[in-house]
């Protein structure tokens, strides 16, 4: 399997619960390296631009409002099959449907406040990583 990079965001609900370290431990325990990381409080403009693909969807305003409601932790994960591995760690979008032991099953409250975001494909990951991290700020190790 190829070495990949994927974007991960720990959303405001999980940051507020003080579980960043527990989530990072899961990434590292699965063999993923954190090669870039920063905390940010997204502006409305940044959240709208990042989630622009969902602009026509009925949940867009609520998603943006939620993502700007508090700080988020944004990281780039690197490793073999990182995109799928991270999606497996996250679990289903709806925490009620997420498998026991996944990040969303353990830390999310609802389909809206679902603890984490992860890129869904290589093309998306490249765009999302570039959105938050200029290449010079990502370090393979």
Curated annotation (Swiss-Prot):
PROSITE patterns: NDPK_LIKE. It is found in: Cytoplasm. InterPro entries: NDK-like_dom, NDK-like_dom_sf, Nucleoside_diP_kinase. Keywords: ATP-binding, Cytoplasm, Kinase, Magnesium, Metal-binding, Nucleotide metabolism, Nucleotide-binding, Phosphoprotein, Transferase. GO terms for cellular component: cytoplasm. It catalyses: a 2'-deoxyribonucleoside 5'-diphosphate + ATP = a 2'-deoxyribonucleoside 5'-triphosphate + ADP; a ribonucleoside 5'-diphosphate + ATP = a ribonucleoside 5'-triphosphate + ADP. Its main location: cytoplasm. Its cofactor is Mg(2+). Gene3D superfamilies: Nucleoside diphosphate kinase-like domain. Its EC number is 2.7.4.6. The active site is at residue 117. GO terms for molecular function: ATP binding; metal ion binding; nucleoside diphosphate kinase activity. GO terms for biological process: CTP biosynthetic process; GTP biosynthetic process; UTP biosynthetic process. Belongs to the NDK family. NCBIfam families: PRK00668.1 (NF001908). Major role in the synthesis of nucleoside triphosphates other than ATP. The ATP gamma phosphate is transferred to the NDP beta phosphate via a ping-pong mechanism, using a phosphorylated active-site intermediate. PANTHER family: NUCLEOSIDE DIPHOSPHATE KINASE, NUCLEOSIDE DIPHOSPHATE KINASE DDB_G0292928-RELATED. This is Nucleoside diphosphate kinase. It comes from Burkholderia lata (strain ATCC 17760 / DSM 23089 / LMG 22485 / NCIMB 9086 / R18194 / 383). The gene is ndk.
């Amino acid at each position: 399997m190829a070495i990949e990079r994927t974007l991960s965001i720990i959303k405001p609900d999980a940051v507020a619960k003080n579980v960043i370290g527990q989530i990072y431990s899961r990434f590292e325990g699965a063999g993923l390296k954190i090669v870039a990381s920063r905390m940010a409080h997204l502006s409305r403009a940044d959240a709208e631009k990042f989630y622009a693909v969902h602009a026509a969807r009925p949940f867009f305003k609520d998603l943006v409002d939620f993502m700007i409601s508090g700080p988020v932790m944004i990281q780039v994960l690197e490793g073999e099959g990182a995109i799928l591995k991270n999606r497996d760690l996250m679990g289903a979008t709806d925490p009620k449907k997420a498998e026991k032991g996944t990040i969303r099953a353990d830390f999310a409250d609802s389909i809206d406040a679902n603890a984490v975001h992860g890129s869904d494909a290589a093309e998306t990951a490249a765009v999302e990583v570039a959105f938050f991290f200029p290449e010079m700020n990502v370090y393979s190790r």
